[in-house]
Amino acid sequence: MTAFDVLVIGSGAAGLTTALALAEKKKVLVVAKGSLTGGSTAWAQGGIAAVLDAGDTFQNHINDTMTAGAGLNRLETVKFVIENAPRSIERLVELGVPFNKDEDTLHLTREGGHSHRRIVHVNDATGWAVQDALLKSAGDNPNITMLSGRSCIDFITDRHGEKFSGRGRVWGVYALNEKTGEVEKHVARATVLAAGGAGRCYRFSTAPRGATGDGIAMAWRAGCRVSNMEMMQFHPTCLYNLDVKNFLITEAVRGEGGQLLHPDTGDRCRVDYEPKRMELAPRDGVARASEEQIKRYG
């Protein structure tokens, strides 16, 4: 059993960017459920929002975000994310993400809830390009070890009778080796949880099949404060067909003029809900309206 400085649970954008930052001075282990590309990051299509247009401002983006969140957002967090987004895009470019360009500048598209064009993208497969670049960088880093096929079961704490110093501390994770069926113990001085969400707890979802909330449950059992679990995001549009696997229809389709039509009349559904922004309203409102239309008309 090798002890690492830091254990990162999850190999998506959050986990790998954390690992790359920490690996400048620390030995890092990344463990992933299923394949290293099996999380939500690789599934993302549309792109990443950042204030990059000369006619846009951070305040515009902040206002749009607070409106989309119905004012429930934590303002300081919103400001931090938005003000650091341009630098994060630059970092992804440095790591090799081939964002689409319009001559010498990044090409910006538009998505729902945004008052300006802010979305940098790699065609319609942005998430896969980001995942690929991060995995290559992590794979080339001698301070990062990555293990796939590890389903994490529980954090290592004094609850399990482990004799590490520091009551209430987390010292790593117990993980099921999906190939051998054995439970492994991965020990680290610090543990970062980046295991994704719980979208697959619902019958209909565009989330990856591994998004079953394992990490959230582990955190709760270890004594972490878990909040805002009712804030589950649903993507407003996906292809539904009983003969094939359903798949997400990217937000960018509506951002570039795609319309949601009534199946019988052919009229635009959104006119009855938000006639000003129509299909470009924030995701929550569009998803609620889509659900109502499906329940009403099948």
Which stretches of residues belong to each language-model region?
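N-terminal Rossmann-like FAD-binding beta1-loop-alpha1 element of flavoenzymes
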Residues: V6-V30
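Glycine-rich FAD pyrophosphate-binding loop
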Residues: A23-I48, A54
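An anion/pyrophosphate-binding glycine-rich loop and adjacent beta-alpha core
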Residues: L36, M218, C224-G298
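Flavin (primarily FAD) binding-site architecture
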Residues: L193-T206
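Residue-level detector of alpha-helix initiation sites
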Residues: G12-A13, S35, A125, A198-G199
